[in-house]
From Swiss-Prot:
One GO BP annotation of this record: spermatogenesis
Organism: Drosophila melanogaster (Fruit fly)
Family (UniProt): Belongs to the MST(3)CGP family.
Name by which UniProt lists this protein: Male-specific sperm protein Mst84Dd
Keyword set, alphabetical order: Developmental protein, Differentiation, Repeat, Spermatogenesis
Length: 72
């Protein structure tokens, strides 16, 4: 999928641009964290296995000693 300024972005803002999770488009999202998971950009830190949850990314839970992001 192509990527253009102001287009779809990653994480809760919209689908990822590019193959897998390539660069994000649009003002609502920052850089993707590649195959690790979606990102939040200005909303907060990256979600998914790459990093902690931000306010727009749902909640953090601990399971079996590992933290992970949960959907809203």
């Amino acid at each position: 999928m192509g990527c253009a300024p102001g287009g779809p972005c990653c994480g809760p803002c919209g689908p990822c641009c590019g193959p897998c999770c390539g660069p994000c488009c649009g003002p609502c999202c920052g850089p993707c964290c590649g195959p690790c998971g979606p990102c939040c950009g200005p909303c907060g830190p990256r979600c998914g296995p790459c990093g902690p949850c931000g306010p727009c990314c749902g909640t953090m839970e601990k399971r079996n000693g590992l933290q992970r992001c949960c959907p809203f």
